[in-house]
């Protein structure tokens, strides 16, 4: 992106840090620390005025102390090395209470947190750099949980739940846009969100939200009053509308092997007067992830070829999908033996052709749609329901909703 205009207020949009994330029992903290160090340098070098994090700061509601240390160290260093504000909303992985607990202390460090949506729409508006002379307004709408959107009732059907959730989301953004209009702001309004926009590309590492994806919304839901909508939840950087006004920044690192080909980035927004000019900054790869699909006959050769690929700053992690093999333990032992001493680490070995998981006969191959479903429990449950011929459609719908509510609580 070109040099910052003299009269611009520069906002950086990022999301889905997932601090404390594990991949096959391996910590991602080394990569996350490198990312946060890099991010801090970009804030200083690019003269960023505000960093906007659109949810999923942490990977769990109760993150490990080491993950909290990464977060608070970044807050402190950002405050020490720059004059930028830090603006954060909670995502579906975050605990709203945990994020907001130190809210008053963080405010003294120019850090503004909204874990739960404010009851009064006017209270969702953050004016930067100051309320007296704002250059941009941030409409802080965090992840909207079911209790924020509808009154749950037993026996509700999927179509009813979907309609109520989508209407609840629409209402939250319309109320916020109306509050911004009532405030008679002379500056652009940037809205935040942590949700699923219908048609956007997902990966295997996103957890179902709004009871199994029932709350996917159309891009047209967001009022035109918002000059830009900074989204989190989906890990692939992408725009969801033709104008590029509604965007996911994506996660800063690949959080699963399904994201290995994603080009990670942060978004830059130069607010000049009433206009918002967009740009992006590519994020370096701190550790390469690689999925090796091979056969028993080609295994040794393919592992040797992998060893020739230059690693990033941290050693490469590999997932091996092996076809033409019948025993996982035996396959795992062979892969471990052949990869010993190589400049990469094999995290996981999977069989590419195994019997169907549910209702399969001997020799039947796995349905391609089942690949990776262990990370998507609601889809596994849906697959199980399809095998139950004695259940009515109404019974299946009720069971599906009950299961997804259970998953949402975990």
Question: Can you name each region flagged by the protein language model?
Answer:
Residues 49-55, 86-90, 188-192:
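Short beta-strand segments at enzyme active-site cores
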Residues 63, 90-243:
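His/Asp/Glu-rich metal-coordinating catalytic cores
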Residues 80-86, 187, 244:
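A short helix->loop->beta-strand "cap" motif at the edges of active sites that frequently abuts
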């Amino acid at each position: 992106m070109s040099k910052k205009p003299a009269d611009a207020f520069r906002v950086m949009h990022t999301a889905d840090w997932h601090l404390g994330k594990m991949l096959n029992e391996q910590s991602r903290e080394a990569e996350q620390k490198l990312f946060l160090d890099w991010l801090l340098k970009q804030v200083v070098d690019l003269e960023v005025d505000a960093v906007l994090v659109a949810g999923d700061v942490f990977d769990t509601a109760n993150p490990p102390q080491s993950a909290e240390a990464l977060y608070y160290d970044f807050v402190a260093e950002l405050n020490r090395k720059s004059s930028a504000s830090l603006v954060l909303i909670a995502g579906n992985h975050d605990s709203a209470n945990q994020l907001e607990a130190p809210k008053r202390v963080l405010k003294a460090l120019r850090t503004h947190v909204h874990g739960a949506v404010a009851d009064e729409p006017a209270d969702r508006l953050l004016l930067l750099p100051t309320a007296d002379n704002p250059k941009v307004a941030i409409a802080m709408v965090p992840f909207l949980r079911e209790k924020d959107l509808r009154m749950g009732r037993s026996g509700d059907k999927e179509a009813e739940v979907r309609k109520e959730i989508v209407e609840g989301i629409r209402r939250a953004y319309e109320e916020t846009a109306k509050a911004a209009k009532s405030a008679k702001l002379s500056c652009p309004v940037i809205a935040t969100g942590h949700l699923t926009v219908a048609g956007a590309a997902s990966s295997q590492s996103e957890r179902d939200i709004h009871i199994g994806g029932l709350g996917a919304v159309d891009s047209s839901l967001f009022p035109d009053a918002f000059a830009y909508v900074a989204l989190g939840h989906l890990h692939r950087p992408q725009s969801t509308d033709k104008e590029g006004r509604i965007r996911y920044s994506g996660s800063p690192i690949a959080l699963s092997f399904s994201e290995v080909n994603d080009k990670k980035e942060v978004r830059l927004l130069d607010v000049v007067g009433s206009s918002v000019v967009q740009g992006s900054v590519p994020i370096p790869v701190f550790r390469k992830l690689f999925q090796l699909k091979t056969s028993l006959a080609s295994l040794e050769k393919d592992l040797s070829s992998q060893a020739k690929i230059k690693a990033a700053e941290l050693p490469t992690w590999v997932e091996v999908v092996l076809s033409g093999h019948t025993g996982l333990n035996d396959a795992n032992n062979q892969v471990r033996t052949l990869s010993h001493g190589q400049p990469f680490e094999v995290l996981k070995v999977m069989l590419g052709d195994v019997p169907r998981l549910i209702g399969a006969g001997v020799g039947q191959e796995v349905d391609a749609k089942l690949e990776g479903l262990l990370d998507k429990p609601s889809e596994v449950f849906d697959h199980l329901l399809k095998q139950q011929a004695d259940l009515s459609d109404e019974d299946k719908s009720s069971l599906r909703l009950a299961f997804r509510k259970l998953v949402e609580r975990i």
